[in-house]
Design a protein with these regions (language model features):
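Acidic, metal/ion-coordinating pockets
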Residues: 2, 10-20, 24-71, 76-442
Length: 442
């Protein structure tokens, strides 16, 4: 593009004028500064610097003066936004729910031989604490529950029914939190025997289920909060002996033993489960039921278990048969029509008893990891530890220890006992069959 010719700008003219003035002043001042120096400037040449009249005459009015020294503007007032406090960062909303681990075991039976093994003649005292010592890691969980099929009353002579109260020391020191006391013979020594048993357990910090010292105690839901997850435990006995019925009716203390089939108690049981469902995130229902040594549940048990699942149970565990029975899923719908899954372990067997029959020397610990997302639960882990009742002689007296049968034999176990333990392990795998639980990983 052709550029347009532009004239001499005003700025250029101004600068040339200043240069001429400075040059003239220098001509008059320098001789004085230099003394004898002879300085001569041709005025004709100086006039030539005017570019032959190209520079017009200038006056001050012709020179624009920028207002560079104008008064500063007033300091701006701070705006409202500058004085406002910073917006606080909102506190993160806590994540609803969490994870809880449960270990649920079968029954403890302090039979005569077991009781005698824990008696020390020198001190004339009982000490059961070593019996579960080899199982402490497996019993560890946020909440651990076992069943006891004995009463503990100092007012009565010790027997296969009445165990020394220090049996609760064994449970408490092994990490057990909850003990289910309801079973058919729980009131065979009257309500005093039942109340003493409950009191002995509670004095050692154990939470009791199934038998109660008062109506208030019976009406109090056993509710625990672990990692933000509310877990409810309930326990019921399938039946009660004639002696127990007489003791209960004599004092009109129907609250003392929670049952499933006595005088309309089934409806009361289901109502209790529904109430627990309304306030808990996880509901565990424990039952003492079934026929001794039966390999599978009866039709009546299956019907009752489905009713319990429909009422809101998430986990059902049984004890009382002294043998392990399968584990299965039960399907039901909640009040909103959503499909629910209930894990049902028909029977966990006996953790401790004196019998040496193949089915009675083994048991299992059901170990669960349950996650609650704020709305519903899921079973992150459903596994088991198989147990074996190791009996051996020491100083002419039998001793009992409960050991995990899938692990290496403990020190001191003879070859014959190792063989029995391995057999027990194979049997429990057979009993569980296609059950949805897996062997616990160490």
């Amino acid at each position: 593009m052709k550029k347009t010719h532009r004239g001499v700008s005003f700025g250029t003219v101004f600068m040339l004028a200043v240069t001429i003035v400075v040059t003239g002043l220098s001509a008059s001042i320098l001789p004085r500064l230099l003394g004898t120096a002879d300085l001569h400037m041709d005025t004709a040449a100086l006039s030539a610097l005017t570019l032959d009249g190209a520079i017009p005459a200038l006056t001050l009015s012709d020179i624009p003066i920028n207002n560079a020294m104008s008064e500063p503007s007033a300091t701006p007032e701070p705006s409202d936004s500058a004085t406002q406090a910073p917006t606080p960062v909102p506190t993160p909303t806590p994540f609803p729910g969490g994870t809880v681990t449960l270990t649920l075991g079968g029954s403890i039976n302090i039979d005569d031989a077991v009781r005698k093994s824990a008696y020390y003649s020198e001190s004339k005292k009982y000490d059961f604490t070593e019996i579960l010592a080899l199982l402490e890691d497996e019993l560890s969980a946020d909440l651990t529950m076992l069943s006891l099929e004995n009463i503990t009353s100092d007012a009565h002579q010790v027997s296969a029914l009445n165990a020394p109260p220090v049996v609760f020391d064994m449970l408490a020191q092994s990490g057990v939190d909850i003990v289910a006391l309801g079973y058919p013979k729980a009131v065979d020594k009257g309500l005093d025997g039942l109340r003493t048993t409950v009191a002995e357990a509670q004095e050692r910090g154990l939470v009791t289920l199934g038998t109660y010292n008062s109506e208030t105690d019976a009406a109090t839901l056993r509710l625990f909060t672990i990692d933000g997850v509310k877990v409810a435990f309930l326990h019921f006995a399938e039946s009660v002996t004639a002696a127990g019925k007489k003791a209960i009716s004599g004092e009109r203390a129907e609250y003392a033993l929670a049952t499933t089939h006595i005088s309309g108690s089934e409806a009361a049981m289901l109502a209790d489960i529904r109430e627990a469902r309304a306030v808990a995130d996880v509901v565990v229902v424990s039952l003492n039921w079934g026929k001794v040594s039966a390999a599978k549940p009866t039709t009546a048990q299956q019907t009752l278990a489905q009713q319990i699942a429909d009422a809101g149970a998430d986990v059902i565990v049984g004890a009382g048969t002294r043998v392990v029975q399968p584990v299965t899923w039960l399907t039901s719908k909640d009040s909103s029509g959503n499909i629910r899954q209930t894990l049902c372990a028909w029977n966990l067997g006996s953790l401790l008893n004196e019998s040496r029959k193949d089915g009675n020397v083994l048991g299992m610990l059901l170990q669960l990891q349950v996650f609650f997302d704020g709305k519903s639960i899921s079973f992150e882990k459903a596994c088991y530890t198989p147990t074996y009742i190791w009996r051996y002689k020491q100083d002419g007296q039998y001793q009992y220890r409960i050991v995990p049968s899938d692990q290496p034999a403990p020190d001191g176990m003879g070859d014959d006992q190792i063989g029995y333990m391995q057999k027990a392990y194979k049997n429990i795998q057979k009993y569980l069959g296609d059950s949805p639980v897996t062997l616990r990983e160490k």
